[in-house]
């Protein structure tokens, strides 16, 4: 079984498309939406879906992607925990493939290649650089739908409670004890936020993150990672 954990904060625009798309996936899984204090209709959207689909649960936790994902993992029942951003969709058949991996002890964790909706060449470049980095380092970003066996996740202490780059910090611990697999079928992230933020700024952000991770530079200011909704 897979526990899909979706941290949310003011995601009323993304969740109405992400949840139905996710629930079309066949497989043995549950969906845990963990809200961090949204002031829009995010909880209403999730609650309405949960009322009609027993696979879905809505939890509330203190704001912060790390604390929300950790809270979801504590309530998870699956062999796998998979962390999915609210504006990102899994490729077709992703969960049945992960179900099939469950008996294989050699596979302890992994993620997906990344892509954006739309056809902007600059966003394709962002994804290309991100995927190149990921295959080289095995450091999986949060928007690549990181999945890990629940017991291993717990043994590593979950995500560190830091405001940004909690996914990088966790994966730095993960790669010391496992070799995450990178699946070629890409997840697709809605390009809206990146277009609103500015695509060139998004590209610069990816490059700076790569520099920070590769050369152990100081963590970038939190404001540089602020979501655009």
PLM regions and their residue ranges:
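Cell-envelope/extracellular polymer assembly enzymes that use nucleotide-activated donors
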Residues: 1-3, 30, 169
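Short, acidic, metal-binding catalytic loop of nucleotide-sugar glycosyltransferases
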Residues: 20-29
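A conserved acidic beta->alpha catalytic loop
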Residues: 21, 35-44, 88
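Conserved donor nucleotide-binding strand/loop of the catalytic core
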Residues: 29, 43-77
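Acidic donor-binding/catalytic loop of UDP-sugar-dependent glycosyltransferases
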Residues: 41, 86-100, 172
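Short aromatic/hydrophobic "clamp" motif used to bind/position activated sugar donors
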Residues: 81
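Conserved donor NDP-sugar-binding/catalytic core segment of glycosyltransferases
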Residues: 93-122
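Hydrophobic helical membrane-anchoring modules
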Residues: 172-229
